């Protein structure tokens, strides 16, 4: 068995459009608003995926996403945050979330948000993704 560390210099890695992995449902008027840096993908070895995710809603808009955790999902917010349906902030940089396998969950993002996301296995199944006016 060949075991070795994986090192990524994240500042040197490009942001990849999430639509290239999850499909056109993540496009808004043909433009990407979600980007990824895949830090590791060990699913072939029975592991999971570690990534940095960047949500970039257009000015005056917010992203609303609903998903189901296909494996335990660990989320650590680095920048930005989530809000509730009225625009009140709910999650902040430094917050940690665990979505256990099978848990339906959602997020509303009206500002650029970057998170470290670690899946124990498969990534989330996205049930709904839309961009809407940020009017409260």
PLM features: what roles do these ranges have?
Residues 32-69, 83, 88-90, 100-104:
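Conserved short histidine dyad/triad with adjacent acidic residue
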Residues 80:
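Conserved strand-to-loop "acid loop" that flanks and positions the catalytic carboxylate
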Residues 1-49, 132-136:
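A short, N-terminal "cap"/entry segment at the start of jelly-roll beta-barrel domains
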Residues 50-52, 75, 114:
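Structural motif
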Residues 101-128:
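Ligand-binding loop in jelly-roll beta-barrel domains
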Residues 72:
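Alpha/beta-hydrolase fold active-site loops
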């Amino acid at each position: 068995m060949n075991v070795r560390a994986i090192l990524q210099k994240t500042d040197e890695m490009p942001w990849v459009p999430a639509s290239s992995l999850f499909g056109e449902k993540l496009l808004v008027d043909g433009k990407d608003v979600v980007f990824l840096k895949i830090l590791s993908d060990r699913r072939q070895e029975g592991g999971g995926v570690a990534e940095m995710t960047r949500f970039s809603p257009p000015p005056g808009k917010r992203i609303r996403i609903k998903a189901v955790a296909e494996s335990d999902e660990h989320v650590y917010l680095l920048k930005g945050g989530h809000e509730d349906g009225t625009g009140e902030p709910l999650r902040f940089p430094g917050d940690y979330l665990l979505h256990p396998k099978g848990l339906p969950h959602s997020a509303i993002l009206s500002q650029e948000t970057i998170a470290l996301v670690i899946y124990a296995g498969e990534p989330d199944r996205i049930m709904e993704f839309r961009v809407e006016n940020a009017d409260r």
